[in-house]
Every structure is written in C-alpha cells, then in structure tokens.
Swiss-Prot record:
Biological classification of the source: Eukaryota, Amoebozoa, Evosea, Eumycetozoa, Dictyostelia
UniProt-recorded name of the protein: DNA mismatch repair protein Msh2
InterPro entries: DNA_mismatch_repair_Msh2, DNA_mismatch_repair_MutS_C, DNA_mismatch_repair_MutS_clamp, DNA_mismatch_repair_MutS_core, DNA_mismatch_repair_MutS_N, DNA_mismatch_repair_MutS_sf, DNA_mmatch_repair_MutS_con_dom, Msh2_ATP-bd
Location of this chain's protein in the cell: Nucleus
Record's keyword annotation contains Zinc-finger: no
Transmembrane domains' residue ranges: none
Binding partners and assembly: Heterodimer consisting of msh2-msh6 (MutS alpha) or msh2-msh3 (MutS beta). Both heterodimers form a ternary complex with MutL alpha (mlh1-pms1). Interacts with exo1.
Binding annotation for ATP: 707-714
Gene transcribed to yield this protein: msh2
Pfam families attached to this UniProt entry: MutS_II, MutS_III, MutS_IV, MutS_V
Length: 937
C-alpha cells in the first residue's frame, strides 16, 4: 500500500465487532481454500473482509482506497492481521513493531444491485468460488451460508448472470483411463443455467489434443476430476487443466458410479430410455452420475424433465486449441500476453489493441439479440467439418445477403425489439418472474407476425429454404402462443403497463381490486385537475405543464428548463428534480395525494398477490415454447448478421466454394484470390492490399513466406487461417474468389514470447507448441507457423526450422504456411515438389525503403533489416555502423566461413530429423557445427 493510500485508509477506522471478527477468523482458519470469496449480506449492502476485501478492491475498483479497517482486539494474540508494504493482508506473530503497522481487519462494502452483480460476474471470471452469508432469522450474531457458486456451478446466481449477455457456465466431470493402449476420456458436461446436460466419450493422443479442443469449444469453466494418482495420464490431465486456467476438484472414484446414472438422467431429461446415451459410453455415464450429484440437480423438482441432452461429436467440428484462438485472434481471451490486434503487416503495422473489432467474433457479432450473440459465439468456436452442413448455412446467408430490403427490415425493426428470451424463460422456470416479464414476453410475441410478414415477402432461389426452416416454424409458434396472449390480455392491465409502467392484474378481474382502482383513479383525476389549475396560475399554456409519473415519485408536474423561471421563488411549488427533459415539481397537496396513491398501490399489490402467482404459474407452462422461439430467433439473427457483416465490409465478402474434407487428393486445395484480413481492413486509415494464395495438394501445399519485418508476413498467414475458419462457420469470406478445402484443424505457432509464470523461455515455448503441432496434425490440417527459431542461436534455429519443415512435408503432408526470416529455407523448393516460395515485396529505389505489402511468387532476394531500422528512426550513427559491419561480415563470409557454411548445409540436408526427439536432432546439428568450426555464439 502506498503512503498516501495508507494515510487515507487509516483515517477510516470502524468500531470493533468482536463477535463477527471471531466468527470470520474461525471461518477462514477452518477452510484452507483461498479461492473462495465470502460476502456477508447486511440487509441493504454486502460486506467483504480480510484478504477477500483486498482482492475485490483491487479487482473491481483498481485501488485500495475503498477499504476501511476494524480496529480489533484480537482474541488470539499469537496471530495478527496486518497490512504489508504491498497492501496485502497476512497473518503473523504478534510483536510491538508489527502492531505499529497494524490497521486491523480490512472491510469493503458494496451496494446491492448493479455493483453486486458486476462483482459476482468478475469473481466468476477470475475463477473464484463465491459464498453469500446472511444473519439467521431472529438472530443478531449467528450467520448461515445461504448461497454458493463456482465458475461451473452458478445455479444460485442465475438472476445475476442472466441479466446480461452471458454464455453460460459449463461444468465438466471427467474420468481418464486406458483401453487397448489408448487414452480414453469419459466426459459429462452440464450447464444448470441453460438446463443442458451431455456426455461424450472419445480416445485421445498423448498430447491430449482432443481434450484441449473440447475444453475450448465447449467453454468449460470448471472440472470435477476422477482421482487416480497412479495413472500417468491423470497427471497430464491435471497439467492440461492448469495450463488452460480451468479450476478442478479431485474426487474419489466412488463418486463416479453408474449405479443410478440412467435413472437420474431420465428424471432430468424426461425422455424415454432410447434417447439416453449408448451404454457403450460407460465412462461418460459414470461422469454424468458425478456431475448430477455435485450440481445437486435432483434436489430441485423444477429441473425434472426440463433438461436437454447435448451431444459433442468429435468428428463434427474442426479442432481448435488455445494457441489458435490466441494466435488468430478468433475470440478475446483473458490472456493479455497475446496481442489483441492482427500482427504487424498487411495494413502498415499492428493494429491498436483498443480497436473494438480486434477479434473475429467482435467483428462478426453485430447481432440484434442476446440469444443471437450466444449462438454466434458457439458457431465461431465450433466450425463445421461436414461440407453439406456448411453449404446449408451458406445458403441461408446468401438468401439474406441478396435481399437488402428483408435484411434491413429484420435488423432495423423486427429483431431489434425482441428481448432476451433465454433470460425470460429462466426467470419463469425458476419462479422469479414478475408480471412485467409476462408483459415483456407478450410484447415480443405480438411482434412475431411482423417478422413473419417480412419473411413471407422474401422471394429468391432459397425461398423454400426460408419457408421450411423459419416461416412454418414461426407460424406454429405464433399459433401455440395464442392462449398465452389471451390470458395476458384478460388478466393484466396493459393500458396501465404502457402508460405508467405499472404491472398489475386488471381491476375488473376482482371486486376488491375494482374498489381500490377506483380510489387510485380518483386521486389521479384530482392531480390532473391540479395540473390544469397550476398551468393557469403560472400563465403557461396547458400543454407546457406535463404530468410525469414514476414508480418512485408517483405523480410530478414537469415544465421545460426554459420555463423554470415561472416557479422560481414561489414557495408553494416544491422542486423535486432537474433533468434534461425539464424541471419536476409538485405542491404540498400533490405530495399528499401521492402518499395516498402510494398507499392504495401497495394495497392493490397485496390483494392481487394470489392472482399474480396463478398468472405466472400459467405463464411458466409456456417455457418450452419460449425456448423453441429463442432458438429460432437466435438462428435467424445469426444468419441475418453474417449476411449484414458480409455486405457492409469495405469490399463485400463473397460466398466461398467448399471442397469436402479429404476430397482434395486429386490435386485440388484451397485457392484464395484477392484475400484480405477481415479485422485489419476495417481499421481507420487502412488501405488494405489484397493477396492470393494457392494451396494445392502435391504442388503448393507448403508455402514458405520470406520478406522484411513489418512487410505483412504475419497478417498474410493469419488471414488465410481466418478465411478458412469463416468458410467452415458458414460465413462469406473477404476475397474476390475463394475455393476452400475443409480442414480438420487449424494449428498455429505464432508470436514469440516468454511464459515466465510457467518458467518457460521463448525457445522452449516454441518447441513445446511446435512439438504439439507435429504430433496432432494430419494430412487434412492447416498449419500456420510464424518465425520459428527466433528464440535461440541462428544455426540452431535454422536447423530446427529446416527439420520441422521437412517433416511436415514428408511425414504429415498437411497444408502449411511457414513465415520465416531464414532465407536459406527457400532452397527446400528445389528439393521437395510440394514446396513453393512466396515473399512480401518492398522497394529500395532512390535510397528509399517502401513496404508494399504485396505477396509475390518466389523467395526474397535480400535482407531488409537495416532498412527497417531506418524506418524505426534509429540514430544515423547506429545505421552507419550497422552498414559497415554488414559489409565486413559479407566480405568475411566470402572466404573460409562461406565455404564451411556451404559444406555444413550440404550435409545438413541429409539429416533425417525425428520430431519426437528434439535433443537428438540438436545433437546431430551440433556435431556438424563442431566439424566445420562454426561458432554460433
């Protein structure tokens, strides 16, 4: 803590609460789980204490100034809570010197509502567990736990999390075993917020690539792990979860019992036996049993028959690991070590990290509805492998792309007015809905005919497709909602809801309510007469004195700020507020009438309680229909959005031609004409240079890209990866023409950076990621490698780059883009027929250096390092010294060093590199270096 912060904080010392302090310290000492943050409900606000308070203050407020301290008499003098110099709280032995540093027990208070909701969301994002404690009824000193949650179990915080655009909280139960020498994962995954549960059982390789892809694509937030300390694979799973930042809990094997799993699943799914997972997925069924138990799903009867079964088919989606998500900037991840902008290059350098369109998802997500945004995120994380499914999506996008009038109608009017149906259904299902929610749902349903009319007006070659998938479904849903609409119109006062935002049962529905409403009407009529009289008293036109109603203040009069002079210095007029829309005021008589109106309103709510509950119960029976509508609207929204984004790009996107997975053996492949990086081209002051790529099987499937730094190599290889991914999502792509061969995974090794928190150097990080690629990639994969070998000596780096490139060509046979600063690698094209060279061009005419960002055929014929240094405004003396030293080295190389270098390369080509044994490969290279006395230092 800084001196200023400590001085400010130490001035705020609260009265000691010995009983609570004793309870809190015993609570902390009895639980060693440092990932749990405890909040105490103080009836109006929440308090957080100790190290929890410091953590939340820094997380949310980015400062410790909001902390206060209890000056405490510690009941345990052997332990004291003190503030360290860095502001953290620690427990230490007592001493007079330490006591002088003590401020006491840190206390942080947070308001209910928006502030509390944001902090809960932030804590869950930080992978923290949360506990809410409250005072026991009729007690002033005893506390009880009333709510708890974790990143993967947010059932008790549904109302908080659904008050925004969340993607759900997926908990995963996992069991790992070996069968016939292969790793087998039995997984069950569930999201209690969105009432989904699923199972998946699959084999994996030693690098756990399938598990990595599953974790990323299913947005797993937390894991329940079947403990098996003797299993070597189990230790690797723990490391994989830790690397992915997934908190996990180790549980005994007894928790993974399939004894009652089938029965439990049937109760949750409400389905017959035939719809349950295959019995062959025994390990997945066992994991499902664990998941159901630890989410305590069977304790809530409201869950019975309400869950939906999800299936994760490993063969349906493209594999994407965290490196690809980060390297290609597909979505925004919390890992800030990776630049959020597309790398330097094609548009004249790296983009600003503050650009809101820095990720592909941010670029595409112009959805009108929260449901659409959630579905789009799922699609971006799970690109398809089946060409027919991809073509089906492209047909929908094309239909809306070619119909501007329909697209604008849906985006500007129809979809924009549809609220969060997921949130509405969860509130109704969880019995937390209000009459206002019923009115909101009614408003959405009554707008559906407008959406239907817009769709009916569409005419194109895809007209039948729109009819079968949207029009007919929407007609059925509208028909099924007819009874709901009739109930709302009969029971809820819609006029009052629209005029005054009061959501009550119609007074005509009950004699008592009719009498109370009469009293309220009499009061409002009196206030209206006051309004007319006051306008006359103020010498203002009657239309200028308006009646303003709010649930908080009831009735107030409002005049413009310009007319405020009319009530100035007149004591009988009481100003309540001044806002942009004018000055709100009243008289004592109006204030008295407001108190009476508030009293009758409260009595009305009390008398209607039973009728309101019955209305909400009936509304809850429509939850399955709401979920169907939500799914339909989300899908429609995504297709309309993808067509919209494709049409408004600086140069409109085009529909790609799709080649099915594995059908490019006859020489076909991915060919992109005039390709562009979708996230870079939209940036301000960017004139993007489009480039071509031809990845043809057996002819040009391995492309080596050389050229100057900042010339566009990184942007070029990333844009190819993004275009392929966009096509497999079912989106149009930024190009003049594109033929995309479906790939089973995109594997990337881009950027050079240390992983200091893991104790991993730049070079080791490169080797680990590259080793993973070599073991996971197949002939149908797209591999993207950017500047491999920068983290070690020149010869080691070059040797490994050569060996890795050769292995990819000869052993894997996949598509690869290999950007490198090792120009010597370009001779691979003379040795291997599938290798082709590309380079990013630059001009050095008239002693000037200009980056052209154009990708051209052939290798780069010179180095531009000094030219780039000039662009970076290096001092002229440094530039001149560099030029002189470069000439000396070139002259030196023309003699013995150059001869040795050439001999080294000749023998180096003959080495058969083993990707599984990096040390052996390095040993072979070092022996050659020693043989020819080549110094790498």
């Amino acid at each position: 803590m800084s001196d200023n912060e400590q001085e400010e904080s130490s001035q705020v010392v609260l009265k000691e609460d010995k009983t609570f302090v004793t309870f809190f310290q015993s609570l902390v000492s009895s639980n060693e789980d440092t990932d749990t943050i405890r909040l105490f409900d103080r009836k109006g606000y929440y308090s957080i204490h100790g190290e929890d308070a410091v953590f939340v203050a820094m997380m949310h407020f980015k400062s410790k100034k909001s902390l206060k301290y209890w000056s405490i008499s510690d009941p345990n003098p052997k332990k004291k809570i003190k503030i360290d110099n860095d502001g953290s709280l620690t427990t230490t032995a007592s001493s007079s010197q330490q006591q002088q540093q003590e401020l006491g027990l840190a206390v942080l208070t947070i308001r209910q509502g928006y502030e509390f909701e944001n902090i809960v969301k932030e804590l869950l994002d930080e992978k923290k567990k949360i506990e809410i404690w409250s005072m026991k009824p009729n007690s002033k000193q005893q506390w009880e736990l009333i709510k708890k949650g974790s990143p993967g179990n947010t059932q008790m915080f549904e109302d908080v999390l659904l008050n925004g655009n969340c993607e759900g909280s997926v908990m995963m139960a996992l069991k790992v075993t070996r069968e016939k020498g292969s790793i087998v994962f039995g997984i069950s995954f569930g999201d209690a917020t969105f009432k989904t549960i699923g199972v998946s059982q699959f084999m994996d390789n030693d690098n756990l690539s399938n598990l990595s892809s599953f974790i990323m694509q299913m947005s797993v937030k937390e894991c329940l792990l079947c403990c098996d300390q003797k299993n070597y694979d189990y230790q690797k799973v723990k490391e994989k979860l830790s690397d992915a930042g997934i908190p996990f809990t180790e549980l005994p094997k007894s928790d993974f019992s399939s004894k009652n799993a089938e029965q439990d699943l049937t109760r949750l799914l409400g389905s017959v036996k035939n719809n349950l997972p295959d019995i062959e997925q025994e390990h997945a069924i066992q994991s499902a049993s664990c998941l159901i138990k630890h989410l305590d799903l069977l304790s809530n009867p409201n869950y019975f028959g309400k869950f939906k079964l999800e299936k994760y088919d490993l063969d349906r989606y493209m594999k994407l690991d965290s490196s690809s998500f980060k390297g290609l900037h597909i979505i925004d991840l919390k890992d800030s070590s990776v630049s959020a902008a597309a790398g330097g290059g094609g548009a004249g350098g790296a983009s600003s990290s503050s650009n809101k369109d820095q990720s592909l998802y941010n670029l595409l997500n112009q959805c009108n509805t929260p449901m659409g945004s959630r579905l789009l995120l799922q699609w971006v994380k799970q690109p398809l492998l089946n060409a027919e499914e991809i073509e089906a999506r492209l047909n929908f996008v094309e239909a809306f792309y070619n119909d501007l009038e329909l697209r604008q109608s849906l985006r500007s009017n129809d979809l924009k007015k549809i609220g969060d149906l997921d949130r509405l259904s969860k509130k109704l299902h969880g019995q937390k809905a209000t009459l206002e929610d019923c009115v909101n749902l009614y408003g959405i349903v009554t707008r559906l005919p407008v959406v239907l009319q817009s769709l009916n007006n569409h005419s194109s070659i895809h007209q039948e497709l729109i009819k079968v998938n949207f029009i007919e479904s929407l007609e059925s849903i509208i028909s099924d909602f007819a009874k709901f609409c009739a109930m709302v119109e009969k029971t809820i006062d819609l006029d009052l809801a629209n005029d005054k935002h009061e959501y009550v049962i119609r007074s005509s529905f009950d004699e008592t309510l009719r009498g109370i409403q009469l009293k309220k009407d009499q009061i409002s009529n009196k206030i209206e007469r006051f309004r007319v009289d006051i306008a006359d008293d103020l010498n203002l036109d009657e239309a200028k004195v308006k009646l303003h109603y709010s649930e908080k203040d009831m009735f107030l009069l409002r005049i413009s700020r310009k007319d405020e002079v009319a009530i100035r210095d007149k004591k009988k007029y009481i100003v309540h507020a001044t806002a942009k829309d004018g000055v709100r005021f009243a008289t004592r008589e109006i204030d008295t009438l407001n108190e009476a109106y508030k009293k009758w309103s409260a009595e009305y709510l009390d008398k209607q309680d039973g009728l309101a509950k019955r209305t909400l119960q009936i509304a809850a029976s429509f939850v399955p229909l709401i979920e169907d509508l939500s799914s339909l609207i989300a899908t429609l929204d995504v297709f309309v959005t993808l067509s919209h984004v494709s049409s408004i790009a600086p140069i409109p996107f085009i529909r790609p031609e799709i080649i099915p997975l594995g059908s490019d053996e006859n020489g076909a492949g991915t060919v992109i004409i005039g390709g562009r990086h979708p996230c870079v081209e939209i940036q301000d002051n960017v004139n993007f240079i489009a480039n071509d790529i031809d990845l043809t099987r057996g002819q040009s499937q391995f492309q080596i890209i050389t050229g100057p730094n900042m010339g566009g190599k990184s942007t070029f290889i990333r844009q190819v990866g993004l275009i392929v991914l966009m096509a497999q999502i079912g989106c149009f792509v930024p190009a003049q023409k594109a033929t995309i061969a479906v790939v089973d995974c995109i594997l990337s090794r881009v950027g050079a950076g240390d992983s200091q928190l893991r104790g991993v150097s730049t070079f080791m990080a490169e080797m680990l990621e590259t080793s993973y690629i070599l073991k996971v990639a197949t002939k149908n994969s797209l591999i993207i490698i950017d500047e491999l070998g920068r983290g070690t000596s020149t010869y080691d780096g070059f040797g490994l780059a050569w060996g890795i490139a050769e292995y990819i060509c000869n052993q894997i046979g996949g598509f690869c883009l290999f950007a490198t600063h090792f120009h010597e690698l370009t001779i691979l094209s003379d040795l291997l027929p599938m290798v082709k060279n590309l380079h990013v061009s630059a001009s050095t005419q008239n002693n000037t250096f200009t980056l052209l960002y154009k990708v051209e055929q052939g290798p780069c014929d010179q180095s531009f390092g000094i030219h780039v240094a000039i662009l970076a405004n290096f001092p002229s003396q440094v530039i001149e010294n560099a030029k002189q030293k470069a000439k000396e080295l070139e002259s030196f190389e023309s003699n013995t060093l150059k001869q040795n270098h050439n001999k080294f390369l000749e023998e180096f080509k003959e080495i058969n590199f083993n990707s599984n044994d990096v040390e052996k490969s390095l040993s072979l290279v070092n022996s050659l270096l020693n043989k020819y006395s080549i110094d790498i230092n």
